Regions:
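RNA-contacting regions in translation and RNA-metabolism proteins
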Residues: 1-110
Length: 110
């Protein structure tokens, strides 16, 4: 699985003309792939959309011939984007919760 993910990502990055080191860890939770290099903003994309799309494609390639029970979760990250984004969303949720408590007005979902 690691080799399949590596080869696929290497080809995609080459087509995008992006120089990056690909580090892959096989954990109990699945494959954790970290891309390291300059100008990773192009890999992240707007609000992580490019990163999410690449993660989805890698997951499809890795799990192509697997059954439902053998599915391997794939997480693709760069520059610690995923944990930074999670922190940002938690801060936003807390701010909105404080506003609701303060104003006692219902908040519309986003």
């Amino acid at each position: 699985e690691k080799d399949i993910a590596y080869r696929f990502l290497r080809e995609v990055l080459n087509c995008m003309d992006v120089k990056a080191e690909i580090k892959i860890k096989h954990t109990e939770a699945g494959l954790y792939i970290n891309l390291i290099g300059p100008k990773m903003g192009i890999i992240i994309g707007r609000r992580g959309q490019t990163l999410d799309s690449l993660q989805y494609l890698v997951s499809l390639v890795v799990n192509k011939d697997k059954g439902r029970d053998d599915y391997l979760r794939v997480v693709l990250d760069t520059e610690n984007y995923r944990s930074k984004r999670e922190e940002t969303l938690i801060r936003l949720a807390n701010r909105l919760a404080e506003r609701v408590v303060k104003t006692r007005k219902r908040m519309e979902s986003i």
